[in-house]
Amino acid sequence: MKILGIDPGTRNCGYAVIEKTGNKKTLIEAGLIKIKQDSLQYQITQLCEGLDIIFKSHKIDAVAIEDIFYAHNPKTVLKLAQFRGALSLKILQIHGEFSEYTPLQIKKAVTGKAKAAKEQVAFMVKKMLGINQEIKPLDVTDAIAIALTHSFNVRIS
């Protein structure tokens, strides 16, 4: 089963494809959809084009995204919500469904602690997948953690 984890953002969108075979999880690909600072419409287009490439490159069985988080700046929340809406629509058009996890659920699934620091999440992601090199940036680590969280919550049919 191939799982796509997505960490939505307005500047960079982290993504990771992992494969789950029984209890074994393997990282297939991870990276960023880089979003150039331009008009909102163009930024959303970049995000959707990046998703198209990922879906065309892999036979994805499941998609998981991080649920929207609270931000202090209302403009940031609004922009992220617009990105999230476009992201959701694109996934539904291509794949048909997706699962959502809050940051606390992801941290708890990966580290055992809902209030874990990002560095703890990064450490556990590397440990779980047997990766020795550093994974950067944290958007990518978060996307891997999202995919792993879904892998713990799904049964292979």
UniProtKB/Swiss-Prot annotation:
Q: Where is the signal peptide?
A: none
Q: Give the record's GO biological process terms.
A: DNA recombination; DNA repair
Binding, Mg(2+) 1: 7, 139
InterPro entries under this entry?
RNaseH-like_sf (IPR012337), RNaseH_sf (IPR036397), X-over_junc_endoDNase_Mg_BS (IPR020563), X-over_junc_endoDNase_RuvC (IPR002176)
State its cofactor. Mg(2+)
Q: Does the keyword Cell inner membrane apply?
A: no
Leading EC class: hydrolase
- Which residues are Mg(2+) 2-binding? 66
**Which GO terms of the molecular function aspect are on file?**
crossover junction DNA endonuclease activity; DNA binding; magnesium ion binding
GO annotations of cellular component type: cytoplasm; Holliday junction resolvase complex
The lineage's top-level taxon is Bacteria
* Primary location: cytoplasm
The EC number of this protein is 3.1.21.10
What is the cofactor note?
A: Binds 2 Mg(2+) ion per subunit.
Q: Active site at which residues?
A: 7, 66, 139
The reaction(s) annotated as catalysed by this protein in its Swiss-Prot or TrEMBL entry are: Endonucleolytic cleavage at a junction such as a reciprocal single-stranded crossover between two homologous DNA duplexes (Holliday junction)
Which Pfam families does UniProt cross-reference here? RuvC
| Localization of this protein | Cytoplasm
Q: Does the keyword DNA repair apply?
A: yes
Q: Which UniProt keywords apply?
A: Cytoplasm, DNA damage, DNA recombination, DNA repair, DNA-binding, Endonuclease, Hydrolase, Magnesium, Metal-binding, Nuclease
The family assignment reads: Belongs to the RuvC family.
**What do we know about how this protein assembles, alone or with others?**
Homodimer which binds Holliday junction (HJ) DNA. The HJ becomes 2-fold symmetrical on binding to RuvC with unstacked arms; it has a different conformation from HJ DNA in complex with RuvA. In the full resolvosome a probable DNA-RuvA(4)-RuvB(12)-RuvC(2) complex forms which resolves the HJ.
Q: Which NCBIfam families match?
A: ruvC
Q: What does this protein do?
A: The RuvA-RuvB-RuvC complex processes Holliday junction (HJ) DNA during genetic recombination and DNA repair. Endonuclease that resolves HJ intermediates. Cleaves cruciform DNA by making single-stranded nicks across the HJ at symmetrical positions within the homologous arms, yielding a 5'-phosphate and a 3'-hydroxyl group; requires a central core of homology in the junction. The consensus cleavage sequence is 5'-(A/T)TT(C/G)-3'. Cleavage occurs on the 3'-side of the TT dinucleotide at the point of strand exchange.
Q: What is this protein called?
A: Crossover junction endodeoxyribonuclease RuvC
Q: List the source organism.
A: Campylobacter fetus subsp. fetus (strain 82-40)
What taxonomic classification does the UniProt entry list for its organism? Bacteria, Pseudomonadati, Campylobacterota, Epsilonproteobacteria, Campylobacterales
